[in-house]
Amino acid sequence: MTQIIPALDLIDGEVVRLVKGDYKQKKVYKYNPLKKFKEYEKAGAKELHLVDLTGAKDPSKRQLVLIEKLAKEVSVNLQVGGGIRSKEEVKALLDCGVKRVVIGSMAIKDATLCLEILKKFGSEAIVLALDTILKEDYVVAVNAWQEASDKKLMEVLDFYSNKGLKHILCTDISKDGTMQGVNVRLYKLIHEIFPKICIQASGGVASLKDLENLKGICSGVIVGKALLDGVFSVEEGIRCLQNA
């Protein structure tokens, strides 16, 4: 069953949205993050997604106090990402009550450390964020999307799927924050080649039609801007995924 996963991006406790990961293209929403997450939970969301953009820029400023409060106050699963670079950071987040930790660039830059983390904390606790951009082939971008690596997406998935990886969060970064619609072709391709991997789709969700198109392909669809801007509600998203 494909789930809608409402998402909040936080900078210094404020709810924001960036366009294509650019801190200069920042929109601040006057929402209290806890109230917003509780609203999403009440509406029927079973999982919530949080990006700690402050911690992504500076790990020493990770918003752990707020994250712990959010994890304690909501009764559904919370997953957190944002520039996580070490085993200690993963442990700190899990100790806060976070259900899953999202790790990204590390998977490309330090596979040994990434595999150690997968082994230590287990495949249910780790989500690999693979931000991808289409060159001649889909390649993985690193460092908050500022550079494309030479690693092909399918090769990275092949490597980690053989090492016990279960959850991925895949973002087509040409779409993120643009509300231009999702890249269904990309997710279908991953699902066909790696049917046992649970795919969370992210980037560009602009309508209920996007959710419909991803039903049965992805385990979850991360929705940020469309919910914050009132394009559709969590309830409508759930109904759409149940009926599509």
From Swiss-Prot:
Top class in the EC scheme? isomerase
- The record's EC number reads 5.3.1.16
The protein's name: 1-(5-phosphoribosyl)-5-[(5-phosphoribosylamino)methylideneamino] imidazole-4-carboxamide isomerase
Catalytic activity of the protein: 1-(5-phospho-beta-D-ribosyl)-5-[(5-phospho-beta-D-ribosylamino)methylideneamino]imidazole-4-carboxamide = 5-[(5-phospho-1-deoxy-D-ribulos-1-ylimino)methylamino]-1-(5-phospho-beta-D-ribosyl)imidazole-4-carboxamide
Species source reads Campylobacter jejuni subsp. doylei (strain ATCC BAA-1458 / RM4099 / 269.97)
GO BP terms, alphabetized = L-histidine biosynthetic process; L-tryptophan biosynthetic process
Kindly identify the residues recorded as the active site.
D9 (proton acceptor), D131 (proton donor)
Pfam family, any one: His_biosynth
Q: Where in the cell is it found?
A: Cytoplasm
Record keywords, A-Z: Amino-acid biosynthesis, Cytoplasm, Histidine biosynthesis, Isomerase
- What family name appears in the similarity comment? Belongs to the HisA/HisF family.
An example Gene Ontology cellular component term from the record? cytoplasm
A molecular function (GO) held by this record is: 1-(5-phosphoribosyl)-5-[(5-phosphoribosylamino)methylideneamino]imidazole-4-carboxamide isomerase activity
Q: Which domain of life is it from?
A: Bacteria
Give the matching PANTHER family: 1-(5-PHOSPHORIBOSYL)-5-[(5-PHOSPHORIBOSYLAMINO)METHYLIDENEAMINO] IMIDAZOLE-4-CARBOXAMIDE ISOMERASE
Q: In which pathway does it act?
A: Amino-acid biosynthesis; L-histidine biosynthesis; L-histidine from 5-phospho-alpha-D-ribose 1-diphosphate: step 4/9
CDD domains registered for this protein in UniProt: HisA (cd04732)
Q: Where's it mainly located?
A: cytoplasm
